[in-house]
């Protein structure tokens, strides 16, 4: 494209400096962005463009060499701007531990009753837990039984069992008066004596068939023996006939 067409074309547009924004990019130094601005148009020249590109290449060359020499990779903004990123906003960075300790001490000094209130709250919480864990809250199954009602089976001594057996053989059924006398003599309650006699009568009924009399088994044996004798006599008669 010849200069005849290029010069009128660039004359219609503004120069590059007028179009440059007021802010600058952190990736490039301010000196590179403003003093060596690229000017296009009739007033521009090729050496100016080469000079600016030379500065940019030098900047990136030095910046990358500094980054490679350091132990970690840094942001180019911190290298090209004011150097230290902690001083960019106008204050110096403080170590976190010391800052935290200072804040903690300041809060303690500012609120002296904080520690005492915390101790009181912890003591109240422990007291509340102790109250909840106290045996005052008892469920029905945790309550002890009444002294008159004992759970489980009653165990009788050999002497008590012997005396009760004697009384049972004498009379399986006890009157109220006799039950009181036996209970006082053996150190038992009327209910215990009554239950023992009931169980003993059930045991006797299981051992002895209640539907038959005590001599019923003997009668059955006699009948069986008589039937056997009759069968033998019939066999002897048949042999004699033959």
Curated annotation (Swiss-Prot):
Cite the entry's keywords alphabetically.
Answer: Developmental protein, DNA-binding, Homeobox, Nucleus, Transcription, Transcription regulation
Q: Name one GO biological process term.
A: skeletal system morphogenesis
Chain positions covered by the region annotation Disordered:
114-154, 206-242
Return the Polar residues bias intervals: 116-136
Record PROSITE patterns: ANTENNAPEDIA, HOMEOBOX_1, HOMEOBOX_2
Family, similarity comment: Belongs to the Antp homeobox family.
Primary role = Sequence-specific transcription factor which is part of a developmental regulatory system that provides cells with specific positional identities on the anterior-posterior axis.
Query: What protein name does the entry list?
Result: Homeobox protein Hox-C8
Species in which this protein is naturally found: Homo sapiens (Human)
């Amino acid at each position: 494209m010849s200069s005849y067409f290029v010069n009128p074309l660039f004359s219609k547009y503004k120069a590059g400096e007028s179009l440059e924004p007021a802010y600058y990019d952190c990736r490039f130094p301010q000196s590179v962005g403003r003093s060596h601005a690229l000017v296009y148009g009739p007033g521009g020249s090729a050496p100016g463009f080469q000079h600016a590109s030379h500065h940019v290449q030098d900047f990136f060359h030095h910046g990358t060499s500094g980054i490679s020499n350091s132990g970690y990779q840094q942001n180019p903004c911190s290298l090209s701007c004011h150097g230290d990123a902690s001083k960019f906003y106008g204050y110096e960075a403080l170590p976190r531990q010391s800052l935290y300790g200072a804040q903690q001490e300041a809060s303690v000094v500012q609120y002296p009753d904080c520690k005492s209130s915390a101790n009181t709250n912890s003591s109240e919480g422990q007291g509340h837990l102790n109250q909840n864990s106290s045996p005052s809250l008892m469920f029905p199954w945790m309550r002890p039984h009444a002294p008159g009602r004992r759970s489980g089976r009653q165990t009788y001594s050999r002497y008590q069992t012997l005396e009760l057996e004697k009384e049972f053989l004498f009379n399986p059924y006890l009157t109220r008066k006799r039950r009181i006398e036996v209970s006082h003599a053996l150190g038992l309650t009327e209910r215990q004596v009554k239950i023992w006699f009931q169980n003993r009568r059930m045991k006797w009924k299981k051992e002895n068939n209640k539907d038959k009399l005590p001599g019923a088994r003997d009668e059955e044996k006699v009948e069986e023996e008589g039937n056997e004798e009759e069968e033998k006599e019939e066999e002897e008669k048949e042999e004699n006939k033959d």
